[in-house]
């Protein structure tokens, strides 16, 4: 299970399988013309994770933001 531990302007810290991972990104200002609240940099995910594990983590982050009515961009 993926747990969001901390979200800052420049990174998201998660715990997954008893390990902590930092995923780099950028927090965005929510404005009328901007529906997105965060950009996640896919290439900042740990290379030791399988592609399935990486997608599991990304999906958990997307669901976290979605539960708050916010959207993310994956780059």
Regions found by a protein language model. Give the residues of each.
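N-terminal acidic leader/helix
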Residues: 2-34
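Absolute protein N-terminus
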Residues: 1-2, 75
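Acidic, low-complexity intrinsically disordered segments
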Residues: 30-75
């Amino acid at each position: 299970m993926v747990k969001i531990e901390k979200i800052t302007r420049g990174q998201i810290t998660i715990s997954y399988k008893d390990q902590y991972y930092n995923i780099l990104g950028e927090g965005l200002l929510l404005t009328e013309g901007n529906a997105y609240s965060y950009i996640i940099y896919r290439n900042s995910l740990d290379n030791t994770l399988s592609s399935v594990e990486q997608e599991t983590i990304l999906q958990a982050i997307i669901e976290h933001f979605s539960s708050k009515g916010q959207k993310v961009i994956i780059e």
